[in-house]
C-alpha cells in the first residue's frame, strides 16, 4: 500500500527526497510521458472554460463531489487507464489528503516543477491532461490491492477536510508544485477529482 495513513488532519511536512532535480528527472520515462501529455493537451486548453478555484469551497461543489463519490461502486465501468475503482480512490486520497496531513509523501519538487509546471498544470490548464505520470508518490502499482469501502469513506473525510481548509496555513506543500494558494488548491482539486471520477463514469 502506498503512503502511511494518519488520522489527524493538520498539514504535514513532506519527507525530503534527496537528489530531486530537473537534471535527475529529465532522464525518467515518467517525465517524458508527462511532457507529451502536456503538449498534446495545449490545443484543447484554449477551447475549455477556465475553472474558478474558489468554487471548490462552495456548498454546491462540496455536495456535488460528495454525491459523486458516494454513488461510486466497484462495478463502475473504467473509461480509460488501468486502475481499478479502489486504486483510483486511493490515488485521490493520496493526491488530495497528503497536504492536509492524512499521508506523509516525499517532496519531489524542484525549481521547474514549482514554477513552470505549476503555472501550466494549475494556473493555465482547465483540465487534467490524460497521461500525466507525475508525481511518482501518487502512482499506484498495478498489483496493489485496497479495500474499496475504506478508501471511499476516507475520500469523503478528505473532501470534508479540504473543503474546510480556507487559508494557506491549512495546507502543506504539494509534493510537485510546492506551496500553493487556497485558490490554486481549489482549482487543482476540482480538476483532479473530476478527472478521476469521470474515469469511472461517476
Could you tell me what each predicted segment is?
Residues 16-17, 23-32, 38:
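N-terminal export leaders
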Residues 35-54, 102-154:
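Short, helix-capping/interhelical loops that line the mouth of catalytic, cofactor-
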Residues 53-82:
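An N-terminal domain-cap segment
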Residues 75-123, 164, 171-202:
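Short, contiguous alpha-helical
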Residues 150, 154-157, 191, 195:
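A non-catalytic, amphipathic alpha-helix used as a structural packing/dimerization or gating element
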Amino acid at each position: 500500500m502506498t503512503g502511511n495513513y494518519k488520522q489527524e488532519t493538520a498539514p504535514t511536512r513532506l519527507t525530503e527526497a534527496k537528489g530531486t532535480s530537473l537534471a535527475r528527472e529529465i532522464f525518467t520515462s515518467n517525465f517524458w510521458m508527462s511532457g507529451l501529455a502536456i503538449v498534446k493537451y495545449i490545443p484543447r486548453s484554449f477551447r475549455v472554460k477556465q475553472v474558478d478555484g474558489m468554487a471548490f469551497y462552495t456548498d454546491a461543489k462540496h455536495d456535488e463531489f460528495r454525491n459523486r463519490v458516494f454513488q461510486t461502486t466497484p462495478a463502475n465501468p473504467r473509461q480509460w487507464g488501468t486502475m481499478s475503482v479502489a486504486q483510483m480512490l486511493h490515488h485521490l486520497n493520496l493526491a488530495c489528503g497528503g497536504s492536509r496531513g492524512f499521508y506523509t509523501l516525499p517532496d519531489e519538487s524542484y525549481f521547474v516543477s514549482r514554477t513552470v509546471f505549476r503555472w501550466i498544470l494549475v494556473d493555465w490548464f482547465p483540465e487534467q491532461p490524460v497521461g500525466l505520470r507525475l508525481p511518482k508518490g501518487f502512482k499506484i502499482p498495478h498489483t496493489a490491492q485496497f479495500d474499496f469501502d475504506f478508501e471511499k469513506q476516507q475520500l469523503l473525510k478528505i473532501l470534508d477536510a479540504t473543503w474546510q481548509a480556507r487559508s494557506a496555513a491549512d495546507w502543506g506543500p504539494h509534493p510537485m508544485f510546492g506551496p500553493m494558494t487556497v485558490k490554486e488548491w481549489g482549482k487543482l482539486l476540482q480538476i483532479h477529482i473530476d478527472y478521476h471520477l469521470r474515469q469511472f463514469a461517476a
